[in-house]
């Protein structure tokens, strides 16, 4: 997207002008720094908050039912009763109280018997991905990932000069046969594969879930080839109907690093997540985390712990699941009403996203400008793959938007998509 294609904030314009001006300090950047880039999600953030636009772009949780009064009371109580501790340095692993709470949350997901001594509190699960890349990957190493996968993880791995190799999915998630084939191909080429990064439950961006019968098979394949599994599960507790699907980590404590987050089940603003790390890997993982942040925010840790202890968070999550189920249903119905017959889309059973596929030959990145003109924002599919090739796919987020806005956003987007499909068919 160029500055001519949309209005830029003054801050963004200044940054672009600064980037255009050559400076002698440019020569000081490391090779790694040249691999750092802003995600497509952040690219459209300033645009998506413009008045009048319906944003189906950002995967933000709904906070409308969060009891802000209780959050305020909890924060006040933490400051009044434990202020000196809350405003001071803490341990690099995170507080024991929060790590114990995290183990209770993971037990609800199906990870039983996890020890707080194996948990590292991180600055969101994004930080856990960064630590994993730092600890395990050398430049040129390979990380396997679902195709498509989370754009933030792609940016993290690429910043460490890691080669991300996509593995295909179908409606039941990562395909084990394709995983085996990709591993064999890369090993035959002499590549070193360190990690499989996977979002098995309600994948971002596709909303697809790895079938229960495939989960152990995927871990077994990785174990056979000495590949660690990095399981990112921020949406695991947000299955619309029924209990969460058992994480890969549950039966594989030595082969899976499990990443969780409070961003989707409580608040992204507290910037707290965690990694459950195999015992034999824990020390180096923890030290790498400590080297960057020294310690997670004591105030935020104590706020989250105290809030969850004084609040029925299980009931709150049940209500949240109902909210997301309603919003997902609104989006699916609107897509059926306003999108052309040539378009297909996923039908998620949880999470935040629907993944739309248009006919081959349609490039959804140029469509973004037309969608903005029509009053709606989405994320083009090319953002979710390491390839720079055009993509006929796009991600729509229903999580942070009320049903009536979802319907209006899809209604606005429908003619844009229909025109692109018709032009492609000529």
Which residues make up each language-model segment?
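PLP-dependent enzyme catalytic core of the Aspartate aminotransferase-like
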Residues: 2-14, 373, 387-426
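N-terminal small-domain helix-loop-helix segment of the aminotransferase-like
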Residues: 18-21, 32-124, 131, 309-310, ...
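A non-catalytic, amphipathic alpha-helix used as a structural packing/dimerization or gating element
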Residues: 97, 284-287, 318-330, 408, ...
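Conserved C-terminal alpha-helix-loop-beta "cap" of PLP-dependent enzymes
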Residues: 282, 286, 356-395, 403, ...
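Conserved core of the PLP fold type I
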Residues: 80, 84-225, 230, 236-257, ...
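Conserved glycine-rich beta-strand-loop-beta hairpin in the small C-terminal domain of fold type I
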Residues: 305, 322-332, 343-357, 367
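Conserved core segment of the aminotransferase class I/II
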Residues: 254-322
């Amino acid at each position: 997207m160029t500055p001519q294609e949309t209005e830029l904030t003054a801050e963004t314009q200044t940054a672009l002008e600064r980037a255009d001006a050559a400076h002698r300090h440019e020569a000081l950047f490391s090779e790694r720094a040249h691999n750092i880039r802003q995600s497509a999600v952040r690219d459209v953030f300033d645009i998506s908050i413009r008045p009048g636009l319906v944003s189906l772009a950002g995967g933000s949780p709904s906070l409308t039912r969060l009891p802000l009064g209780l959050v305020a009371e909890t924060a006040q109580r933490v400051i009044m009763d434990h202020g000196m501790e809350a405003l001071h340095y803490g341990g690099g692993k995170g507080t024991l109280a929060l790590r114990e709470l995290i183990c209770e949350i993971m037990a609800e997901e199906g990870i039983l018997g996890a020890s707080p001594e194996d948990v590292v509190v991180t600055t969101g699960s994004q930080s856990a991905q960064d630590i994993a890349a730092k600890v395990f990957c050398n430049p040129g190493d390979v990380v396997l990932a679902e195709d498509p996968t989370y754009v933030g993880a792609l940016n993290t791995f690429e910043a460490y000069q890691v080669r991300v190799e996509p593995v295909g999915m179908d409606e039941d998630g990562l395909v084990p046969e394709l995983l085996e084939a990709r591993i064999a191909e890369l090993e035959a080429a002499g590549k070193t594969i360190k990690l499989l990064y996977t979002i098995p439950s309600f994948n971002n961006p596709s909303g697809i879930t790895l079938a229960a019968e495939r989960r152990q098979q995927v871990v077994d394949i990785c174990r056979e080839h000495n590949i660690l599994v990095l399981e990112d599960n921020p949406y695991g507790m947000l299955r619309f109907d029924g209990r969460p699907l058992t994480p890969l980590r549950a039966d594989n404590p030595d082969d899976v690093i499990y990443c969780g987050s409070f961003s989707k089940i409580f608040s992204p603003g507290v910037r707290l997540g965690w990694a459950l790390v195999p015992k034999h890997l824990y020390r180096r993982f923890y030290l790498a985390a400590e080297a960057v942040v020294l310690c997670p925010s004591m105030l935020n840790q104590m706020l989250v712990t105290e809030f969850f202890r004084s609040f029925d968070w299980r009931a709150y999550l049940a209500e949240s699941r109902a909210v997301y189920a309603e919003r997902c249903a609104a989006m699916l119905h609107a897509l059926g009403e306003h999108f052309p017959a040539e378009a297909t889309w996923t039908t998620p059973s949880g999470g935040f996203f629907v993944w739309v596929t248009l006919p081959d030959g349609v490039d959804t990145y140029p469509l973004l400008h037309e969608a903005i003109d029509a009053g709606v924002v989405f994320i083009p599919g090319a953002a979710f793959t390491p390839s720079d090739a055009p993509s006929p796919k796009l991600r729509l987020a229903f999580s942070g938007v009320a049903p009536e806005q979802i319907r209006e956003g899809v209604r606005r987007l429908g003619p844009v998509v229909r025109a692109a499909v018709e032009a492609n068919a000529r």
